[in-house]
Swiss-Prot record:
Binding site for substrate: M226, D250, Y251, D252
Organism: Emericella nidulans (strain FGSC A4 / ATCC 38163 / CBS 112.46 / NRRL 194 / M139)
One annotated GO biological process: L-methionine salvage from methylthioadenosine
Compartment list: Cytoplasm; Nucleus
Name of the molecule in the record: S-methyl-5'-thioadenosine phosphorylase
Pathway, per record: Amino-acid biosynthesis; L-methionine biosynthesis via salvage pathway; S-methyl-5-thio-alpha-D-ribose 1-phosphate from S-methyl-5'-thioadenosine (phosphorylase route): step 1/1
Function noted in UniProt: Catalyzes the reversible phosphorylation of S-methyl-5'-thioadenosine (MTA) to adenine and 5-methylthioribose-1-phosphate. Involved in the breakdown of MTA, a major by-product of polyamine biosynthesis. Responsible for the first step in the methionine salvage pathway after MTA has been generated from S-adenosylmethionine. Has broad substrate specificity with 6-aminopurine nucleosides as preferred substrates.
An example molecular function term from Gene Ontology annotations: S-methyl-5-thioadenosine phosphorylase activity
EC number of this enzyme: 2.4.2.28
Binding site for phosphate: T45, R91, H92, S124, A125, S227
PANTHER family: S-METHYL-5'-THIOADENOSINE PHOSPHORYLASE
Length: 355
């Protein structure tokens, strides 16, 4: 927490795990995991400690796009006498040291795909842009408006290969239905859920001006955060089903009868609602892990979509682009003999040019 109220000084001291202590604890875990992991959670570090889940591995994966924002923690959970594996990644680092515009989203998504992930549940604190979405309410967004500024790398398809994937529906409706059902099942236990909404993703790290906040309301925006993009776009490019769960922590700065958003306000509501958030995410993971959803979490509806979205013929890919694409989609692109022949000719030309 960046800000602290004076009253918090009088509260009992709670020991916080230091970076060295956390690193030491995670170092004890195995650094490999053999089986594919289909489901992942991206969120804050608090969600790594889910009730009923046991940490069994901590993976440090290097990608062509760099290092992910945290090690990927593999969690085991028993559901209906079956052990289910779930991957967890801390979006802003293990100690929330990575700013929204610094999150290595490409490395995060690529690393998750490399261990078999095909469905991502993303969790985020958001500001509410509508009166009916109160602080501590949950929202399952179905649309997003991109207000980032191009500072964040936002595509896998560049530097020698061009691709365009559909993004009309940025979230996966099949996964969203499960999330909504789980949320409504917990409404008697403190969870208040809004089934749909338009998410505004802003650049940050500063909060909105009052004029911006009112503008987003006039556009029909429901909630606002700094985390959804390019995460959701990259997941689509990687053929991964993606659904975000939003937890409202404030009314941004448009509301005339409440205080403007502060970090202290955000963190306070997140802490107060932490139990509900964990129960919600746990319920979703339990449902996704059920045998009847085994096909759904493999996101087969997206399989092969990249092949149809690429505009650059394989023969014309740069060597660097080919290496990146084969890392992200191993065995995915078959190179026929004619293309191999062209590549060999090109290689020979390049070699003779040095003589």
């Amino acid at each position: 927490m960046f800000l602290r109220s004076v009253s918090s000084i009088t509260k009992p001291f709670r020991r916080i795990e230091s970076p060295k202590q956390l690193a030491r604890r995670m170092a004890v875990l195995p650094d490999t995991y053999a089986d594919p992991v289909r489901i992942a959670v991206i969120g804050g570090t608090g969600l790594r400690e889910l009730p009923g889940f046991t940490q069994v591995a901590s993976l440090n994966i290097q990608t062509p796009w760099g290092t992910p924002s945290s090690p990927i923690t593999i969690l085991h959970h028993t559901h209906k006498d079956k052990t289910v594996a779930v991957a967890f990644l801390s979006r802003h680092g293990l100690h929330h040291q990575i700013a929204p515009h610094e999150v290595p989203a490409r490395a995060n998504i690529a690393a998750l795909r490399s261990i078999g992930v095909r469905t991502i549940i993303a969790f985020s604190a958001v500001g509410s842009l509508q009166e009916e979405i109160k602080p501590r309410d949950f929202v399952v967004p179905d649309q997003v408006i991109d207000r980032t500024k191009g500072i964040r790398p936002f595509t896998f398809f560049e530097g020698g290969v061009v691709g365009h994937v559909p993004f009309g529906d940025p979230f996966d409706e099949s996964v969203a239905k499960i999330v909504r059902a789980c949320g409504h099942s917990l409404e008697g236990e403190g969870v208040k859920l809004h089934d749909r909404g338009t998410l505004i993703c802003m650049e940050g790290p500063q909060f909105s001006t009052r004029a911006e906040s009112k503008l987003y309301r006039s556009w029909g925006g429901s909630v606002i955060n700094m985390s959804c993009l390019p995460e959701a776009k990259l997941a689509r490019e990687a053929e991964i089903a993606y659904q975000m769960i939003c937890m409202s922590t404030d009314y941004d700065c448009w509301h005339e009868s409440t205080e403007d958003v502060t970090v202290e306000m955000v963190m306070g509501n997140m802490k107060a609602n932490a139990v509900n958030a964990k129960h919600f995410v746990t319920a979703v993971l339990d449902e996704l892990a059920d045998d009847r959803n085994a096909e759904l979490v493999q996101a087969k509806q997206y399989a092969g979509s990249v092949k149809f979205g690429l505009s650059t013929a394989q023969a014309n890919w740069s060597p660097e682009a080919r290496e990146r694409m084969n890392w992200l989609f191993p065995g995915y692109f078959e190179i026929d003999l004619y293309i191999r022949y062209l590549l060999l000719i090109q290689r020979d030309i390049d070699l003779t040019s040095w003589n």
